[in-house]
Amino acid sequence: MLFRSCHGYKDSHIGMLPLAKMYADMKFNILLPDLHAHGLSDGDDIQMGWKDRDDVIRWIGVADTLFADSTGRQRIVLHGVSMGAATVMNVSGENLPQSVRCFIEDCGYTSVWDEFSHQLGEQFGLPPFPLLYAASALCKLRYGWSFGEASPLAQLTGKKSQMLFIHGTSDDYVPSAMVFPLYNANPKAQTEHGGVQRFNSIWITPGCAHAKSFHDYPAEYGRHVRAFLEEKGFFQ
């Protein structure tokens, strides 16, 4: 079993070590690479989890080689926090090998546009027009993607991703309201008895600021993660 982490904005693999310890205690192998333009990775400009998804997919291939068991099989969970959570959601919308079993996103945003629009209003009291429109157009010219295009919500919509969503109620950096459209983007499936089966789960942490759910509720965090992983076939 493998835990592959995705850290947050201007963080590095170091910031994911507490989560790595939680997974190590559950007997997971650990892979802690840095995202583009962070830590020890190459690059000068942060890609907000959009182009990073391609790097993560390549790392999955590396992990399948390094950590497969004696039968060649592998079970991977991708777990991201903040921008890393957005990265994980972006990855979940791509065609992935069967070794990737599930995803955990902690306080990720619906899209780069939504997050930048929120920050522009909160920090500077400015509307999206014209600054955000101009910046998005420049990003498209320089990096090949726009702020609206970089959308975890779009990546999740209609996909049967096995995902645990975590968000704090007092998050004013990535508003907690963003988690609900993300959670509801995943389709429901009818059970054979006419009930409804969800492919994902959600845990809202009371009073937690941005990216503080594990810090504030370490034991509960571990229990929720383990229960989700057990449901998805780990530990068997």
Q: Can you name each region flagged by the protein language model?
A:
Residues 1-2:
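Short, small-residue-biased leader/transition segments that mark boundaries at the very start
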Residues 90-145:
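Hydrolase active-site cap/lid region
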Residues 12, 38-75:
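Catalytic nucleophile-loop/oxyanion-hole region of alpha/beta-hydrolase
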Residues 9-22:
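The serine-hydrolase catalytic nucleophile loop
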Residues 158-160, 165-167, 171:
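Short beta-strand/loop motif that positions the catalytic acidic residue
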Residues 20-42:
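Conserved alpha/beta-hydrolase
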Residues 173, 208-222:
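Catalytic histidine-centered segment of alpha/beta-hydrolase-like enzymes
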